[in-house]
């Protein structure tokens, strides 16, 4: 595996987010999903619509999320949509709960433990995914960020339970 290029900025604004996106040199094409964590109701651990809105609109993106596997305000589609509304994400884009109508398995390549991930069926509807993640400490894994957002973040409720149980 080659070395990754990492882009950093001290300026955290909608404009700096667009600058970093443009620096990648890979324009979003087709149906664009923007994977974020919409956060738990009453919490503050999510990227705010005011920060990501300009980028999401620029790429004509749909925010994509999956329901959680634990108790909270995102463990059912109905509750999740209410949380999304209260956090203001419907004000900037369409939102798709990608496991709302079921899930399917995708293989994990070059694996050590899990043979597959279980993701929402709507994930098939997207040609291009932009992953926007906040960096945080996580009670179970120690750290959370882009890789977690792209693996367990696109996993359906069943997929999240599968991953957290180490595939058992």
Q: Predicted segment positions?
A:
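N-terminal and secondary-structure boundary signal
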Residues: 1-168
């Amino acid at each position: 595996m080659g070395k990754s290029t990492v882009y950093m900025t001290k300026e955290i604004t909608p404009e700096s987010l667009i600058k970093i996106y443009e620096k990648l040199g890979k324009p979003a094409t087709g149906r664009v999903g923007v994977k974020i964590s919409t956060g738990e109701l009453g919490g503050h651990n999510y990227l705010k619509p005011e920060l990501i809105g300009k980028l999401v609109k620029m790429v004509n993106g749909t925010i994509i999320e999956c329901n959680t596997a634990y108790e909270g305000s995102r463990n059912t589609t109905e509750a999740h949509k209410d949380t999304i509304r209260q956090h203001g994400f419907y004000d900037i884009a369409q939102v798709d709960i990608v496991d709302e109508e079921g899930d399917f398995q995708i293989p994990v390549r070059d694996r050590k433990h899990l043979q597959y991930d279980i993701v929402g069926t709507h994930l098939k509807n997207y040609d291009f995914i932009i992953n926007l993640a906040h960096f945080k400490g996580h009670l179970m894994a120690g750290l959370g960020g882009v890789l977690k957002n792209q693996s367990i973040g696109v996993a359906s409720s069943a997929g999240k339970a599968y991953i957290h149980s180490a595939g058992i």
